[in-house]
């Protein structure tokens, strides 16, 4: 996992250069949004169960996926879906705090699509639930933090597509 600071420094180091104006601006932007990201992470942590519950209600609860024969029909499958959504929310929050999506690639997306396909997990419904989670999260953290957080939800959706 990297963060925005490490990414900028590593890029300069690989080239054997000092930080240029563009790199300094990236760091400045990261530091200027630090308090916003920390407040958003605290809000998400305090409301994680509600975010998951509302996301499921918006996207999955009343669809064919929860009816008999659907992919979330048994309690065990439903619990696995809730667990996965919580996992996505947590790691998207970590990525937002770090200002870098690399943790999503390393800990979430690496092999996930293949695993879901082999288990018959409907990727379209998963993406729909993640997008609902993005919407619910934005409504809680506000538009500025929501825009930042949305980048990481979109990154997960893109990786699953």
Curated annotation (Swiss-Prot):
Function recorded in the entry: Light-harvesting photosynthetic tetrapyrrole chromophore-protein from the phycobiliprotein complex.
InterPro entries given in the database record: Allophycocyanin_b (IPR006245), Globin-like_sf (IPR009050), Phycobilisome_asu/bsu (IPR012128), Phycobilisome_asu/bsu_sf (IPR038719)
Cellular location(s): Plastid, Chloroplast thylakoid membrane
Family named by the database record: Belongs to the phycobiliprotein family.
Quaternary structure annotation from Swiss-Prot or TrEMBL: Heterododecamer of 6 alpha and 6 beta chains. The basic functional unit of phycobiliproteins is a ring-shaped hexamer formed from two back-to-back trimers contacting via the alpha chain subunits. The trimers are composed of alpha/beta subunit heterodimers arranged around a three-fold axis of symmetry. The phycoerythrins also contain a gamma subunit which is located in the center of the hexamer.
Keyword vocabulary terms for this entry: Antenna complex, Bile pigment, Chloroplast, Chromophore, Electron transport, Membrane, Methylation, Photosynthesis, Phycobilisome, Plastid, Thylakoid, Transport
Protein name, per record: Allophycocyanin beta chain
Principal cellular location given in the protein's record: plastid
Gene3D superfamilies, A to Z: Phycocyanins (1.10.490.20)
Annotated binding of (2R,3E)-phycocyanobilin, by residue: 66, 71, 76, 81-84
Record carries keyword Membrane: yes
Example of a GO cellular component annotation carried by this entry: chloroplast thylakoid membrane
Species assigned in the record: Pyropia yezoensis (Susabi-nori)
Membrane topology of this protein: Peripheral membrane protein
Misc note: The light-harvesting antenna system in red algae and cyanobacteria is formed of phycobilisomes. These are composed of the phycobiliproteins phycoerythrin (CPE), phycocyanin (CPC) and allophycocyanin (APC). Cyanobacteria also contain phycoerythrocyanin (PCC). The phycobiliproteins all share the same subunit composition and organization with variations in the covalently bound open-chain tetrapyrrole chromophores.
Description of post-translational modifications: Contains one covalently linked phycocyanobilin chromophore.
The organism's place on the tree of life at top rank: Eukaryota
PANTHER family: ALLOPHYCOCYANIN BETA CHAIN, PHYCOBILISOME 32.1 KDA LINKER POLYPEPTIDE, PHYCOCYANIN-ASSOCIATED, ROD 2-RELATED
Positions carrying N4-methylasparagine: 71
Pfam families reported in the protein's UniProt record: Phycobilisome
GO BP, sorted A to Z: photosynthesis
Keyword Transport appears in the UniProt entry: yes
NCBIfam families per record: apcB
